[in-house]
């Protein structure tokens, strides 16, 4: 099954909700969209200039998202109830994920921090890492892993161990997207170097050439990862062995966020104004 829905406002990132729908940030319109299992689209205004960016399902059954434009974390229930939690001015939150501790963890691009927010809205700053932290994910080791877009490194944070950094071998790589896979590895994109990176928890960092400005990456439940090639209007599927298969999208699509839906299908946010479910 394939499905495409036109959604104005700059679809940027997606997350599967507990209600069986896909939830989408609309970075240009300051809104969140819901795409139901039947394809119906609902919109939930957030605020002008709020720039909703990354989104994650929380352990409380709500959707949590970063407001990069007005320094807030947003929470939206599946019934449409919106709550906001202010952060420091200029923090510019971007990446967000659910952690192993039942809280949400997020990056602050502007202030260079890693923050934590509990489901009842208590925020705390855990680390100042610099380097423009971008996306963040829960790792198979229950730490959070994040990309340092201007720091040319991958960071790992665990409340017990603190912060460690892995410098990338390619200079000026511009890492952005990051995900954890079922084979105990961390995968990440290098948008400025046209590469995909992989860090096994028990091995050395690896890099794979992947032209097309790779942006987001998501783990495939069947193994390997999918990557949005923002600069080439394509998607790539990369196996655990490094084999690459690409899929063309319409010209000017600007593919960004990727997420698997409750039905097991891959969904893609196209900043040009569409949300696409890839054919099975």
UniProtKB/Swiss-Prot annotation:
Keyword annotations: Antibiotic resistance, Lyase, Magnesium, Metal-binding
A biological process (GO) annotation for this entry? antibiotic catabolic process
What Pfam families does this protein map onto?
A: Vgb_lyase
Which domain of life does the protein's organism represent? Bacteria
This entry carries the following GO cellular component terms, namely: outer membrane-bounded periplasmic space
| Active site (record annotation) | 256 (proton acceptor)
Residues binding substrate are: 215
Q: Does the keyword Lyase apply?
A: yes
Instruction: Return the Gene3D superfamilies for the record.
Output: YVTN repeat-like/Quinoprotein amine dehydrogenase
Q: Which residues bind Mg(2+)?
A: 254, 271
Which cofactor does the UniProt annotation name? Answer: Mg(2+)
MF terms from GO for this chain are: carbon-oxygen lyase activity; magnesium ion binding
Question: What is the main EC category here?
Answer: lyase
Q: What does this protein do?
A: Inactivates the type B streptogramin antibiotics by linearizing the lactone ring at the ester linkage, generating a free phenylglycine carboxylate and converting the threonyl moiety into 2-amino-butenoic acid.
- What is stated as this protein's family in its record? Belongs to the Vgb family.
Q: How does it assemble?
A: Monomer.
The record, for HAMAP family, names: VirginiamycinB_lyase
> Would you tell me the protein name for this molecule?
Virginiamycin B lyase
**Which species is listed as the source?**
Mycobacterium sp. (strain KMS)
């Amino acid at each position: 099954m394939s499905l495409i829905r036109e959604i104005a406002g700059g679809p940027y990132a997606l997350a599967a909700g507990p209600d069986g729908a896909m939830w989408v940030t609309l970075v240009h319109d300051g809104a969140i969209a819901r795409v139901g299992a039947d394809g119906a689209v609902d919109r939930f205004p957030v605020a002008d200039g709020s720039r909703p960016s990354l989104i994650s399902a929380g352990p409380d059954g709500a959707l949590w998202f970063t407001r990069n434009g007005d320094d807030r974390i947003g929470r939206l229930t599946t019934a449409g109830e919106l709550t906001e939690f202010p952060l420091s001015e200029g923090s510019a939150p971007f990446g967000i994920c659910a952690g192993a501790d039942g809280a949400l963890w997020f990056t602050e691009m502007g202030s260079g921090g890693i923050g934590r927010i509990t489901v009842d809205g208590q925020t705390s700053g855990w680390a100042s890492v610099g380097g423009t932290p971008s996306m963040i994910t829960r790792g198979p080791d229950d730490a959070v892993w994040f990309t340092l877009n201007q720091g040319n490194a991958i960071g790992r944070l665990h409340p017990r161990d603190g912060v460690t950094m892995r410098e990338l071998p390619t200079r000026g790589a511009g890492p952005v997207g990051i995900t954890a896979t079922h084979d105990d590895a961390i995968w990440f994109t290098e948008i400025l170097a046209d590469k995909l990176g992989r860090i096994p928890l028990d091995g050395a960092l690896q890099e794979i050439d992947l032209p097309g400005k790779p942006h987001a990456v998501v783990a495939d439940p069947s193994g390997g990862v999918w990557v949005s090639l923002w600069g080439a209007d394509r998607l790539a599927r990369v196996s655990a062995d490094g084999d690459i298969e690409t899929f063309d999208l319409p010209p000017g699509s600007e593919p960004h966020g990727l997420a698997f839906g409750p039905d097991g299908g891959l969904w893609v946010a196209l900043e040009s104004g569409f949300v696409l479910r890839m054919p099975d």
